[in-house]
């Protein structure tokens, strides 16, 4: 069975770049959300195996969305992906339930 991955970023070019990279590596069940509120809604609908989510977004930021997702599913696999690489931000994300943290830009 294919793994379902939810990509969450308000920047369409970033979602496309990650989606293209994952597609080239055999992932086919890829879904997109444009902000944290959209991510929480789609998480409930899709039940993804993995969420890759930005932090700085309109309507609901990634940390708020992470907490809402973890409230729905305490075992949710959420990886934060942000340009904010300060140690304090990484620690906030991990304390909020992120499984990992990727700093942008990346190759």
Language-model regions, residue ranges each:
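Two-component/phosphorelay signaling modules centered on CheY-like receiver
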Residues: 12-31
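Acidic catalytic/metal-coordinating carboxylates
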Residues: 35-38, 61-64
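Active-site beta3 strand of CheY-like receiver
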Residues: 46-52
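Receiver (REC) domain active-site loop signature in two-component systems and cognate sites
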Residues: 57
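Short, conserved "switch-loop" micro-motifs in signal-transduction and mechanochemical regulators
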Residues: 84-85
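A Lys-centered signature of the CheY-like receiver
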Residues: 104
């Amino acid at each position: 069975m294919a793994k379902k991955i939810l990509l969450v970023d308000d920047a369409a070019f970033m979602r496309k770049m990650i989606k293209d990279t994952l597609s080239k590596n055999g992932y086919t069940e890829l879904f997109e959300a444009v902000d944290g509120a959209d991510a929480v809604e789609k998480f409930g609908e899709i039940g993804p195996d993995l969420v890759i989510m930005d932090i700085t977004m309109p309507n609901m930021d990634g940390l708020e969305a992470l907490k809402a997702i973890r409230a729905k599913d305490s075992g949710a696999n959420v990886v934060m992906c942000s340009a904010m690489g300060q140690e304090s931000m990484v620690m906030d994300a991990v304390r909020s339930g992120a499984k990992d943290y990727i700093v942008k830009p990346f190759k």
